[in-house]
UniProtKB/Swiss-Prot annotation:
Catalytic activity, as annotated: IMP + NAD(+) + H2O = XMP + NADH + H(+)
Broad class of where this protein is predominantly found: cytoplasm
Protein name: Inosine-5'-monophosphate dehydrogenase 1
Any one Gene Ontology molecular-function term assigned to this protein's record: metal ion binding
Organism of provenance: Bos taurus (Bovine)
Length: 514
């Protein structure tokens, strides 16, 4: 018998791979392409993988995906789409406070349970008022009360069916002449549960269901469109009022307090303090201010890349941390400022420290593929923030343009001179608003059209689930537990290994991801 054969079965398995602790034990800075995760044992299907993960101490998402607060990535359309698919979007602040607050308001109004502050008109208003409300708010199903306010006696409702075929000369017609009167309405009594109200609405086949008290006064309304959204987007991120979750970015200067007030009034659920280097007296002071004035508001600090930076913000009271410095595709901070850290190392080091205090970590930057998302989550990140990966989608701000026959959208770093020249908010992010000479920490560019994130994000979700399946983790919490226990094994990649792991040896090929 050959001396290399083992008797007694296959109980012996040699140690293979590195634990995360061993991977990051030396002083080398590693990023996502520098290592791989070794596969585990599969005893479940990919669609069984639970992607629920914490955004902050008190907010949990069903999908660990976040859109970055950049002016070429996230405004209302992106934030709505991200929330519908289980993630969240952060509205950028390279704009006026009023514009930003209005974008948050659009997200919060997109889907609601009981709508307690709907647009209400009186019988003496005109058809023109309804059309104006439709332009401003995007809908025309408007309840009519005696005084045109909530809490007043319900007398009817105006829908698009009542006014669709009216000529322009009829825009001065009073609503009392065109509305559907109270005696033809289906209503529900105050105190009804949302589930019961939705059942009544389904049976009635109406577009809106007014909720009235025993004096027939309007107290709320629910919309049929929200029923459809519930059916079509089961993973949607919602608050306790069944409105979509929405985040917003603010700076750390004194005038940002006014912006913060408007954002909280608009209904923002979480605030991210937007700074390229978060370990500053300015950010610590702003965290203290927010926690004192708005104790219910969740605050994400950052950006940080070391445990020492994280400590100061955790001590200040942040509910989450944003990790990354100079690793974004449009960021040149490491090149210009000589500061930063490779993103793989940054995520692991900060997450390993912050978890001891129950503070979730967002991996922000350097995400180029769905594999990078899986690696970031495997290193301890609870969620992943994306900029370039979501840029040039239909929902991203900006207009498409063509160059050499390719459909493109502009994408720029918030530290680029383009962004700084648009608004001082992006200058504050890099502590340069008072400088005579602006030091760019980002570039402007363009990205090829990716289509709608309604297709792209489901691809990312499925990719994460398949990655976790190959690893042998049924959920993201299991994935992190495997990493910290040492069960999850990694391996460094040489440059040759990275080339081998990509497409190679072909004369030509087409790379279709979804």
């Amino acid at each position: 018998m050959a001396d290399y054969l083992i008797s007694g079965g296959t109980g012996y398995v040699p140690e293979d791979g590195l634990t995360a602790q061993q991977l990051f034990a030396n002083a080398d800075g590693l990023t996502y392409n520098d290592f791989l995760i070794l596969p585990g044992f599969i005893d479940f299907t990919a669609d069984e993988v639970d992607l629920t993960s914490a955004l902050t101490r008190k907010i949990t998402l069903k999908t660990p995906l976040i859109s970055s607060p950049m002016d070429t990535v996230t405004e209302a359309d992106m934030a709505i789409a991200m929330a519908l698919m289980g993630g969240i979007g952060f509205i950028h602040h390279n704009c006026t406070p009023e514009f930003q607050a209005n974008e948050v308001r659009k997200v919060k109004k997109f889907e609601q349970g009981f709508i307690t502050d709907p647009v209400v008109l009186s019988p003496s208003h005109t058809v023109g008022d309804v059309l104006e409300a439709k332009i401003r708010h995007g809908f025309s199903g408007i309840p009519i009360t005696e005084t045109g306010t909530m809490g007043s006696k319900l007398v009817g409702i105006v829908t698009s069916r009542d006014i669709d075929f009216l000529a322009e000369k009829d825009h001065t017609t009073l609503l009392s002449e065109v509305m559907t009167p109270r005696n033809e309405l289906v209503v529900a009594p105050a105190g009804v549960t949302l589930k019961e109200a939705n059942e009544i609405l389904q049976r009635s086949k109406k577009g809106k269901l007014p909720i009235v008290n025993d004096r027939d006064e309007l107290v709320a309304i629910i919309a049929r469109t929200d029923l459809k959204k519930n059916r079509d987007y089961p993973l949607a991120s919602k608050d306790s009022h069944k409105q979509l979750l929405c985040g917003a970015a603010v700076g750390t200067r004194e005038d940002d307090k006014y912006r913060l007030d408007l954002l909280t009034q608009a209904g923002a659920d979480v605030i991210v303090l937007d700074s390229s280097q978060g370990n500053s007296v300015y950010q610590i002071a702003m965290v203290h201010y927010i926690k004192q004035k708005y104790p219910h508001l969740q605050v994400i600090g950052g950006n940080v890349v070391t445990a020492a930076q994280a400590k100061n913000l955790i001590d200040a009271g942040v509910d989450g941390l944003r990790v990354g410095m100079g690793c974004g595709s449009i960021c040149i901070t490491q090149e210009v400022m000589a500061c930063g850290r490779p993103q793989g190392t940054a995520v692991y080091k900060v997450a390993e420290y912050a978890r001891r205090f129950g503070v979730p970590v967002i991996a922000d930057g350097g995400i180029q593929t769905v594999g990078h998302v899986v690696k970031a989550l495997a290193l301890g990140a609870s969620t992943v923030m994306m900029g370039s990966l979501l840029a040039a989608t239909t929902e991203a701000p900006g207009e498409y343009f063509f160059s050499d026959g390719v459909r493109l959208k502009k994408y720029r770093g918030m530290g680029s001179l383009d962004a700084m020249e648009k608004s001082s908010s992006s200058q504050k992010r890099y502590f340069s608003e008072g400088d005579k000479v602006k030091i760019a920490q980002g570039v402007s560019g363009s990205i090829q059209d990716k289509g709608s994130i309604q297709k792209f994000v489901p691809y990312l979700i499925a990719g994460i689930q398949h990655g976790c399946q190959d690893i042998g983790a049924r959920s993201l919490s299991v994935l992190r537990s495997m990493m910290y226990s040492g069960e999850l094994k990694f391996e460094k990649r040489t440059m040759s290994a990275q080339i081998e792991g990509g497409v190679h040896g072909l004369h030509s090929y087409e790379k279709r991801l979804y």
